[in-house]
Each structure stands twice: as C-alpha cells, then as structure tokens.
Amino acid sequence: VRHTDSELSELARQLKSLDGETRVVMEATGNYHAPVAKLLHDAGLYVSVVNAKLVHGYGNNDLRRVKTDKKDAVKLANYGLDRWLTLPRYVPEEDTRLLLKNCYRQYRQYSKVQTVLKNNLISLLDTVFPNVNRLFSSPIRGDGSEKWVDFVAEFWHCRCVSEKSERAFTCKYLHWCRKHGYNFSEAKAYTIYAEASGHIGVMPKSETTKLLVEQAVSQLRAISAALTALKQEMRTLASQLPEYSVVMDMFGVDPTLGPQLIAEIGDARRFYSKKALVAYAGLDAPPNDSGDVTGKHKSMSKIGASSLRRTLFLVMSVYLQNAPLDEPVYQFMDRKRAEGKPYRVYRVRPGFQRRTIRSQ
C-alpha cells in the first residue's frame, strides 16, 4: 500500500468492513507511520501507535531469531492481541505543537551543522590568519552575526592587515566598525595589528585563498541566519500555547530554552502524573532489588527523550552559573555538594533533574 490518499482510503474502507471490533496497531517509526495513522484515525478507526522498543522486546523466547517484515507483522499483531484492552489510543497532535516540535528538530540539526562549519572556518583561518577568532569577545547579535566572522570576511589574510601601517589599519578598522555597527576600540586595533604582524600565513595571499575563506564565511552566515529565523518562529509558535507563560516564569528558562522545553514535553495533560513525565524524559531510576538486597545506587534509565534531557541539562547550567539561594532546585544541588558528592554527580544527578522537570 502506497502512502497516497486513494490507496490509504481504500485500506481504511477494507478495515472498516471487517466483522467485529478492529484496532490498528503500528510502530512509531520516525515519520513513516504518521500519514497512515492520521488517515486511519480520521476514518474513525481505533489506532494505537506503540513505541518500537516495547514491540522489539516482546515475545523474544525463540532460540532462532528471524527478522522479516512478515514475522514483524505477526509479532506486532500478537502484541496488540495480548494488550488489546490497554492499547493507548492515537491522538493527532495539535498543528501548533506539531510545527513547534519540527522547528526544534530542524533547529538541532542546523546547530550541529553550524558547529561543523564554524570549526571548518577556524581550521582554515589557522593557515591564513591564526587566532583571529580569539581576538574578539563580542556576543552574538540578534540576527546571528558574529564580529570575528564579519572581520575575516573583510580581512581574510594576516597580510591584509600587516601590509598596511599601524595608523592606516587603525583608520580602516574604524571605518569597518562604523559600517557594520560595531564598537571601535583603538587598543583593539593595535592588538589585531600586532597579532597579524606576528604570523606568517601558510597559504599565500591569493584569489584562491580569498575564495576559500569567503565561501566558508558565506556558509556559516547562511546557517546562522537560518538558526535565527527558526528561533524566532519557535518563540512565535510557543507563545500561542497555554503553558507558555508558566514555563517562561521558571528560573533558568530564557526565550530560547522555553520553546525547546515546550516542544519536547508536548501537551503535559497527556501525562497522568509527575512520575510519568519523569519517565518520559528517561530520568527515572528503576528498582534494583534482589532477595534481601536492596539497591541503593541506581542510575537513571535514559530510556526516553534524549533531547529533553539535553534541554534540562542546559537549564541546570543556568542554576550553576547564577547560584540562586532561594531556589529549591539549587538548594538541593548545594546540599548534595556539601555531602561531598563529586562535581559530575551532583550536576547531573537524576534527582536534581527530576526536581527540575517536576517544577514545571
């Protein structure tokens, strides 16, 4: 069956024509199952989308493991029959939440690409203008541009600076700062000139070298602009959801982390308790007891949304940087630190992260 409207509609018609109660059980396989689940749900069928990990570990009591589509279908059918009465019903996400989640997925992908492109540009500059990226400490602008990136687009080789006199470069740097809206510092101009004069470019100052640097800068600027656009769109989408004001009032949550939390958690009303939300993030510590032995050192399961754990880790970093003494989460962390817990333990301790997520 192809994923077209006509063929999926015919599939829904045939399923509805079957005698008795019909339920459709599917594995959550990326986005491949989404159009099928949505159309069958809209057709009035009972659809259940099951975590693939649950099905994978179901009924593995054979010595001979067979992996074919037919065997997987039979296994999935048996799973559905065994849990017929407890199969969770598939409910399509709201359009706003769906768009927000996909925006964040793209944002994460582009962030990885930005890191690769930034490292590539720095590596290239090591052959033409070493350490130039370390000469500037200006924060990233709202449009995603960075001062050192804009600088190397103009002064792409150390000889572009050192061939001029110190006075001539200072004047040119002044005009460049005014043109791009950056603050000018005469001391900074002297530092840049001294740095450029002390280096010898491995690659010659040529049109080919200029092309390489310009292309690297162009790619980095493009991905930075895309990230800025996605970040703004995520804020717009998140602000339309009812929990936005509550999340944004939390300590450690800024206009960037707030939409990320909302995107990863989704509709919090679908969780029956706080523990369910903790387990969804993979921060739960399963029991580890046997006989008379009661396990005391339990690590978190990490069976859950890794991207949500990453966002929570960033929120915890804000706690560590600001040390708010009146915040319960920081008080918990500080207490564990006073007990002598190692730095990495009290920073990523599951209990600390669980308290962070429960405060939401």
Predicted regions and their residues:
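A detector of single, family-specific signature residues
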Residues: 1-360
